[in-house]
Design a protein with these regions (language model features):
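Short, well-ordered coil/turn segments that N-cap beta-strands
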Residues: 1, 31-34, 57-61, 101-104, ...
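Short acidic, glycine/proline-enriched helix-loop-strand junctions
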Residues: 44-62, 151-156
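A short, structured active-site edge motif that brings together acidic residues
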Residues: 62-69
Length: 201
């Protein structure tokens, strides 16, 4: 399955420029099979997700969130819209809750700015690191790869998509179907996927 792990819409992310419908339309056009909605410090309610799924029945739409941590690093929590995550301030509590529930945690764009990888220095560690995204260049990807080797963490490509017209540069292809959003935990932690990127012309 072609999967977008990291996406934003105008509904809940002020930095995004596409509506949910615009983003879903672009995902379908580019033959994505699944997407995680990871708004900044906000989650979609179940009824909102259900409405979006009805409008785009060929796309598997899953919840998630991008949390801003105290040192300004960002953590994706995938497969959940549990609002308790929005109230937790300490990374230790967030990661403990996620691990117990098997919600995949991914340190987003860890080398996009100086403090974006603070969690790797203070611990505890997330389940995975982002490697390449639309907003992280090849050098940042190389830095992520080096740190992932050091800590024995999986790497995932993601769009970090804020606009429909920037979609389709980086994603993962999974070896197994995602039926529920939570299944991404086992897929990534067991290496049942490949990182993919748009081929240069």
């Amino acid at each position: 399955m072609k999967v977008e792990l990291h996406s934003h819409t105008m509904r809940y992310s002020g930095c995004a420029v596409s509506t949910p419908a615009q983003l879903m339309t672009a995902l379908v056009k580019q033959k994505y099979d699944a997407v995680y909605l990871t708004e900044h410090d906000a989650v979609w309610d179940d009824w909102e997700l259900d409405n979006l799924r009805r409008d785009f029945p060929g796309l598997r739409i899953f919840p998630g969130v991008e949390l801003t941590l105290p040192h300004d690093d960002h953590l994706l929590v995938l497969g959940t819209n549990d609002r308790e995550y929005l109230t937790l301030r300490h990374p230790e509590l967030i990661l403990a809750k996620a691990r117990q529930a098997k919600h995949l945690t991914v340190l987003a764009h860890p080398f996009r700015w100086p403090k974006a990888h603070s969690l790797l220095e203070t611990g505890p560690l997330p389940d995975a690191l982002e490697s390449r995204t639309h907003n992280s260049d090849a050098h940042a990807g190389e830095q992520s790869q080096a740190v992932a080797r050091q800590h024995h963490l999986p790497l995932v490509n993601a769009g970090d998509t804020h606009a429909a017209d920037t979609l389709g540069h980086f994603w993962i292809d999974t070896y197994a179907d995602l039926v529920t959003g939570g299944e991404i935990y086992d897929i990534v932690t067991n290496g049942m996927y490949e990182n993919a990127m748009k081929k240069r012309k």
